[in-house]
Amino acid sequence: MNRRGFLNQTAGLGLAALGAPNFARAAGTPNFVIIFLDDSGWADFKPFGHPNYPTSNVDRLASEGCRFNNFYVPQAVCSASRSALLSGCYPGRTKVFGAHGPRARGLDPSFATMGQVLQAKGYRTAVFGKWHIGDQPETRPPARGFDESCGLMYSNDMWEFHPQNPQAYSKFPLQFWENGKVKIERVTPEHQPMLTTWYTEHAVDFIQRNKSNPFLLYVPHSMPHVPLFRSEKFKGKSGAGVYGDVMMEIDWSVSEIMKALKESGLEENTLVVMTSDNGPWTSYGNHAGMTPFREAKGTGFDGGTRSACIMRYPGKIKAGSASTQAFSTIDLLPTFAQLAGAPLPANPIDGKSVWDLIVDKPGAVNPHDYYAFCTGPNFEAVMSGDGHWKLHVPHTYRTLVESGNNGKPGKFRQASIELSLFDMDKDPFETINVIDKYPEVAARLKMYAAQHRKQFFD
C-alpha cells in the first residue's frame, strides 16, 4: 500500500554564562508545548485511524495543525527515547539504552537538555509528568534545565505491584516528586488515578503564570503505560474499556492545556507538539494501544519506532494538513533552538533543524542522510533521510506469540531477521525484502549502517 495513500547543567551550553534571566517576550518569540504520551499506539487516535475512542480534542488539534504520519524515535523504549528527545542525541552517543530503574544515573550531565538550551535563552521551563532520564540529584529535572517540575522519576509500573517483578521493585518506593523534593513517599493505587489530573493542573497553572514570558512546557504523561489508571470522572465513560477511558482522559488533558493557552492569549504564538515515546506494548492486549505496522515497542520495526505526531502553530503550520515527511525526536531540540534564536549545545548532537519540512517549504529536503534505530545497546536498522528506504542489519527481536489481558502481560518469543531492505513507500509494513532488486540502494544504506555502528557501537 502506498504510504501517501495509507494514511551538566549549563556547562554544556554555548551561552551558559548568561544563566536564565526573566525577560519580556520579544516579538515573534514562540512558546513550546510538548505533550509526550507513554506507549501510545500510532493508531490510537481518530486522525491516525482509530474510530472508537472519544478524543474530540485531539481530533481538533489535528484539524488546526498538521498530522505527521512518518515521525520516528531512535529507540522504542522509555529512557532511551526520552533522552533522545531532550538531548537531540542518538542513544549510541549518550549510552542511554532501554528503561532505567530507580536511582539510575541516566543521561550524563555532559549532555545539555532542551530545557537548558531554552533556559539559557531566558525561557521559563517546566516538566510535569514521567521524567525517566535520571534519578540522582545531578540528573533530576531541577539540575537539568527545568525551573519547575513534578511527577515520577521512572515508569509507573516500577513499584511493589508489578505483575512480574514485585520483589525487585518493592526495594524502592515509587515516589512523586515536586520541584526537587519528594511530595509523596510511596505512590499507591489510590494515587495513580490522579496522575493525569495532577500533571494537567500543574501545566495549566504554569501557563497562566507565564503569559509574559516565553516558555517550554513538557508534559510527559505516565499514561497509557501499564498499569492503566484513570480518575473517577472518566471511569466507564468511553464505552471502549479501561484503555479507552485512559485515552479519553488524556484527550481532556489536551483540552485543558489548549484552553489555558487560548485564555492566556498565547495559542497563536505557541508551537504544540503531541506524540509518544514509542509504539504500543502489545503484550498487554486490551490494555495496550494499536499500530498497523510490524511488531511494537521494544523493537526496531515501525510498530515500535514510528509514533503518531500532531503539531499546531497557527500561521506557520497549515491547518488540517497531513505530511509524509520523515523526521525524528532528535530533530526537535535543534528545531526549537532555531525558532527561539538559541545556540545549540556545546556538546555534539545528532539532530538537525527540520523546520522547513514541518512548514512544508517548497523544495525542502531532509538534512539527514539517514536515521538509525537500536534496541537496548543493539544496533538494528537505518532508514534513508527521506523515509523511503529502510535497511535492517541481521538481528534478533522479540515477537508476540500470546497476548495478555486486563493488565497481565502475554508471551514473546525470539525471532530473527536477515539483512533486509524495505521500500517504505510501497511496503510500510516491512514485509517484502527487496534487497536483491535494489542493490545500489542497499549498498548506500549498508555504508551508513557501517558508519553508525563504528561511531557509536564498536
What are these regions (language model features)?
Residues N2-S420, K426-D458:
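Formylglycine-dependent sulfatase
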